[in-house]
Amino acid sequence: MVEALLSGIVLGLIPVTLAGLFVTAYLQYRRGDQLNL
């Protein structure tokens, strides 16, 4: 039961972490692009 819960938490956290990193990189890219202009 605990193993299933932990695996569910991990599987839920991985996409959220990847999405957060992607959004952060995208915002930094947009900010740098605006500064270059």
Swiss-Prot record:
GO cellular component: chloroplast thylakoid membrane; cytochrome b6f complex
Main localization (coarse): plastid
Transmembrane segments: 5-25
Localization: Plastid, Chloroplast thylakoid membrane
InterPro entries, alphabetized: Cyt_6/f_cplx_su5, Cyt_6/f_cplx_su5_sf
Alphabetized UniProt keyword annotations: Chloroplast, Electron transport, Membrane, Photosynthesis, Plastid, Thylakoid, Transmembrane, Transmembrane helix, Transport
GO biological process, alphabetically ordered: cytochrome complex assembly; photosynthesis
A GO molecular-function descriptor: electron transporter, transferring electrons within cytochrome b6/f complex of photosystem II activity
Membrane association type: Single-pass membrane protein
Pfam families attached to this UniProt entry: PetG
Subunit structure: The 4 large subunits of the cytochrome b6-f complex are cytochrome b6, subunit IV (17 kDa polypeptide, PetD), cytochrome f and the Rieske protein, while the 4 small subunits are PetG, PetL, PetM and PetN. The complex functions as a dimer.
Biological role: Component of the cytochrome b6-f complex, which mediates electron transfer between photosystem II (PSII) and photosystem I (PSI), cyclic electron flow around PSI, and state transitions. PetG is required for either the stability or assembly of the cytochrome b6-f complex.
Sequence similarity: Belongs to the PetG family.
Protein name: Cytochrome b6-f complex subunit 5
Gene source species: Nephroselmis olivacea (Green alga)
Gene: petG
